[in-house]
UniProtKB/Swiss-Prot annotation:
Assembly information from the UniProt record: Homodimer.
Reactions the enzyme catalyzes: tRNA(Pro) + L-proline + ATP = L-prolyl-tRNA(Pro) + AMP + diphosphate
Gene label: proS2
Function comment: Catalyzes the attachment of proline to tRNA(Pro) in a two-step reaction: proline is first activated by ATP to form Pro-AMP and then transferred to the acceptor end of tRNA(Pro).
Organism ancestry: Bacteria, Bacillati, Actinomycetota, Actinomycetes, Kitasatosporales
Alphabetized Gene3D superfamilies for the sequence: Anticodon-binding domain (3.40.50.800), Bira Bifunctional Protein, Domain 2 (3.30.930.10)
Protein name, as recorded: Proline--tRNA ligase 2
Protein family membership: Belongs to the class-II aminoacyl-tRNA synthetase family. ProS type 3 subfamily.
Length: 471
């Protein structure tokens, strides 16, 4: 009798496969309150690596980290009408504290534009105080009616950047820099994710923004996932909070602002873009464990060689874990590491010891081959870089093969329903066509210029709408 698969095959039931993988790879579990989640150590380790890589890129822009309160006075949300209207259905409101009803209810932050702008208005007085560049790593709460681990949860972790500038051009350019040189660079070069950079339509724009730049990725089932956004806020929040500065000419001027964010949703994207029927495939540059060295048997000589090999690979600059457990069968351990997507397994048994070799299993391309133990430290860094490039290439090939250029709304709907993306001239689709797409569970993920670059305006000549079903 054939052995039952560990995971539901993706082709049979993609949502079930996703939930199976989250569970079996020990990434997360459901929390006790609907829509919340417990991020398990392996899943949180991925988030920590994302934080490390992102934080370094954010700080290169001159942005500094800070932290603002979780609770926001409800009155703050009335100061920017579009913003509060956009978030009203998702708000969690605290009405009691210390056993008493609060004089003013407090909102659990859905995002921090309001409270951060209150402090910006105090901190910015002169042109010398600009630009003001702040980021925070935090949790936010947006009440979710249809939760799915990592993709849509009531509470999630993220980073949110907030900046104030003296001119429109400076703010616009900073938002674009975050979009391309922080987010896209991280997603392509660390996560090995193929992303489309574009601008949101007015319908999809962030509440209170004048322009939203987005990064959209195609998942394994052809649906789109928004991976991160960078917003030009214009002077909307500055006007609401009277955030002004004294210019060099001695005039009081309103600041120009941006905000931008990315979340633990990227872990869900990692699963759906790179995972296969055997589990996760973690990009080597991201992986908290790039190489796991396993003992096939609990022989003392084998265990000693496994530990020695682990030390040599660590000395070569690799992130290594030694699995020398003797109370768990080797086959079970190998399957567990495959599920977790560790890029390379180095397996050592008594026969390997005699031959001076190890069996090397590469998770991303698949397959095993014997490699001399003495050659591992020299060969594995190159193999890991090859596998990093392979993941990105596979993601790009998937999108290219499942994206079609169309000329009618009907063709766009058909492409999205079939698990693909469609590119249609925005002049053909327009806002009326965008509304029609919604009736078929599809949406405009972003607008791109004819050459694939980010357009400077929604109605720029030649703009193309990227249409898909989305998470």
């Amino acid at each position: 009798m054939a052995k039952a698969p560990v995971l539901t095959p993706r082709a049979d039931d993609f949502p079930r496969w996703y939930q199976d993988l989250i569970n079996k790879a020990e990434l997360a579990d459901n929390g006790p309150v609907r829509g919340t989640m417990v991020i398990r150590p392996y899943g949180y380790g991925l988030w920590e690596r994302m934080q490390q890589e992102m934080d370094a890129r954010i700080k290169e822009t001159g942005t500094q980290n800070a932290y603002f309160p979780l609770l926001i006075p409800q009155s703050y949300l009335t100061k920017e009408a579009d913003h509060v209207e956009g978030f009203a259905p998702e708000l969690a409101v605290v009405t009691h504290g210390g056993g008493k009803e609060l004089e003013e209810p407090a909102v659990v932050r859905p995002t921090s534009e309001m409270i951060i702008n209150d402090y910006f208005s105090k901190w910015v007085q002169s042109y010398r105080d600009l630009p003001l560049l702040i980021n925070q790593w935090a949790n936010v709460v947006r009440w979710e009616l249809r939760p799915r681990l990592f993709l849509r949860t009531t509470e999630f972790l993220w980073q949110e950047g907030h900046t104030a500038h003296a001119t429109y051009e400076e703010a616009r350019d900073f938002a674009a820099h975050i979009h391309r040189h922080v987010y896209a660079d991280f997603m392509e070069n660390v996560l090995a994710m193929d992303v489309v950079l574009g601008r949101k339509t007015a319908k999809e724009r962030f509440a209170g923004a004048v322009n939203t730049l987005t990064l959209e990725g195609m998942m394994g089932d052809g649906k789109a996932l928004q991976m991160g956004t960078s917003h030009e806020l214009g002077q909307n929040f500055a006007r609401a909070f009277h955030t002004q500065y004294l210019s060099k000419e001695g005039k009081q001027e309103l600041v120009w602002q941006t905000s931008w964010g990315s979340t633990t949703r990227m872990i869900g994207a990692l699963v759906m873009m790179h995972g296969d029927d055997n589990g996760l495939r973690v990009p080597p540059r991201l992986a908290q464990t790039q190489v796991v060295v396993l003992a096939i048997k609990g022989d003392e000589a084998v265990l000693a060689k496994v530990r020695e090999t682990g030390d040599r690979l660590k000395a070569a600059g690799l992130r290594v874990q030694v699995d020398d457990r003797t109370d768990v069968p080797f086959g079970r351990r190998a399957v567990d590491w495959e599920l977790k997507g560790v890029p390379v397994r180095v397996e050592v048994g008594p026969r390997d010891l005699e031959n001076g070799t190890a069996m090397v299993a590469r998770r991303i391309p698949g397959g095993k081959e014997p490699v001399a133990l003495d050659a591992l430290a020299a060969l594995l860094p190159t193999a890991l870089e090859e596998d990093q490039a392979l993941l990105l290439r596979q993601a790009r090939e998937r999108r290219a093969s499942r994206t079609s250029d169309v000329s009618t709304i009907e063709e766009a709907v058909e492409a999205a329903a079939g698990g693909g993306w469609a590119r249609i001239p925005w002049a053909t689709l327009g806002e009326r066509g965008e509304a029609e797409l919604a009736e078929h569970a599809a949406s405009v993920r972003c607008l791109v210029a004819e050459d694939g670059s980010v357009p400077g305006a929604d109605d720029a000549p030649g703009n193309v709408a990227v249409v898909a079903r989305a998470y």
